[in-house]
Amino acid sequence: QPPAEVSDQRVSGLTGAVHSPPKGPNWAAMPTVRTPAGGGDAHNVRSLSVMWTTRLVRSGLAALCAAVLVSSGCARFNDAQSQPFTTEPELRPQPSSTPPPPPPLPPVPFPKECPAPGVMQGCLESTSGLIMGIDSKTALVAERITGAVEEISISAEPKVKTVIPVDPAGDGGLMDIVLSPTYSQDRLMYAYISTPTDNRVVRVADGDIPKDILTGIPKGAAGNTGALIFTSPTTLVVMTGDAGDPALAADPQSLAGKVLRIEQPTTIGQTPPTTALSGIGSGGGLCIDPVDGSLYVADRTPTADRLQRITKNSEVSTVWTWPDKPGVAGCAAMDGTVLVNLINTKLTVAVRLAPSTGAVTGEPDVVRKDTHAHAWALRMSPDGNVWGATVNKTAGDAEKLDDVVFPLFPQGGGFPRNNDDKT
């Protein structure tokens, strides 16, 4: 249900959430959604595309090429998966004849050892973080229980990139991953993990052991889940769970139940984090709308699940609440529409905001129902398609379904542009 009112609370350090295209390989056009100015009919929308053409980065890819060969070539994961824009992107209406993104999977599946039709990869353990490759055909996926990060592809067998030691007790483990904004140069990945004593943020270099960035985040029997995202080339935002204790989320001296800002993340002499937002329950997901720079925060509290918004002007509002607590998880946003995974009800819904007011224009639309069951992560690929990753093996489903990485719109069309874009 929509919130009763909008808060004018300000959050330090989350301004400038509109970002510049990073240097790296070409990205395909990404379809966007836009509601009419003035908050008119939310279903009358038009498709836009943003063309990002950048220089191909040739250095530092040899280590990753061995992971995904076959017909897909070398899997590439660069700055653009972690670094949002720092300048307003130029948006131009595309001709009506511009086709939407094609079906994300080939008509004939690659003959993998794990036969899982209709997905990029099957036979996974319960997943957490997901990073799409710049070719829209490869990805990095994290397994929460095992701590493994796997390189996967639509046309190659998976390969383990690294295994991070974690304690998966309760809902902890390897909870999210994100690439450095300068990944093409430094090959660094950040992870949010559980240890036997705490939750923490670590940095992982290729072929090296994890190095601590932020430690001492309270750990509990539940409420450990969280998320990571870069809101600028130098700012890492961390959403931490309340460790099962809402009082910790309200305690300014605790790192639990917060959206934290880490400036210039480093393993030596790290500046203490600052709190951007308090009162977080169990973490769901973080996502940025690259068109208007809004940061969306999905979390689960004792009274309701909710979706909050932090604008590029650092204003905070509650976008939507779910009193029935369907289990909000990962999200993806584009031009005022936010897709949110609901784990308990096996749904993905689209929440739409009016551009002039930021108010929700109606009940969330269901864009996925039951397909692949319980999905957590949700990420957009550069070609405009949307991908999810499931947590069936740990979601209490009696069927004990395999966990997979799958396209949200298998028939193509990409990010939903109107209420007819449903599966």
Model-derived features: positions:
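Sequence/structural signature of beta-propeller domains
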Residues: 46-48, 52-423
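Short intrinsically disordered, low-complexity coil segments enriched in acidic
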Residues: 1-6, 314
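Short, low-complexity, intrinsically disordered N-terminal modules
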Residues: 4, 14, 18-21
